Amino acid sequence: MKILLLDNYDSFTYNLCDYLLQTGADCKVARNDALSLSEFENIDFEALVFSPGPKRPADAGLMPALIARYHDSVPMLGICLGHQALGEFFGAELVKAAMPMHGKTAEIRHSGHPLFENVPEHFTAMRYHSLLLRSLENTPLECIARTGAGEIMALAHRSLPLLGVQCHPESVLTDFGLQILKNWIKIAASARYAGIDRQTHGTLP
């Protein structure tokens, strides 16, 4: 699978790239302000990954425009800032977290979505963020992982291969981070994604 990793000026982007390469994928990295939208269209890629980064999605160069351009034709994975960008694009509200979580781990509970295949229902993940998506109500997105406090930690579009994780799978302090990325590659590569039986996993209210 040919992946284009959009670098939102995050210091761990190349850790993420290395993990993606370990899955067997081909991964190219481009800064979010390095190319025009038309230049991105000349790159040969089959899936998009949006890296973590500072500030808000609106400050992340071409990331919002790439989501608008490719959301209905290219599989996507948003991580931290990228997760927030996907949520905002589909109408979710991005708010300040009650407590900033920079370099802190948390226990995450997932719903059984294929993104978490072979990952225990409860696992530990690293968090670096002060903003989060408050609700996915009235959007085409579903929550597929939360903290014990109910904070949204992962989302999935209900009919498109678009996924987001607020935590950092590229961190060594995230359990099963590489497995999560392998699962996403499997989802992105599968032409049958839209036909997955949604009754095989739940959502988290």
Which residues are covered by each model-predicted region?
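Two-component/phosphorelay signaling modules centered on CheY-like receiver
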Residues: 17-26
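Cysteine-nucleophile active-site neighborhood
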Residues: 45-117, 181-183
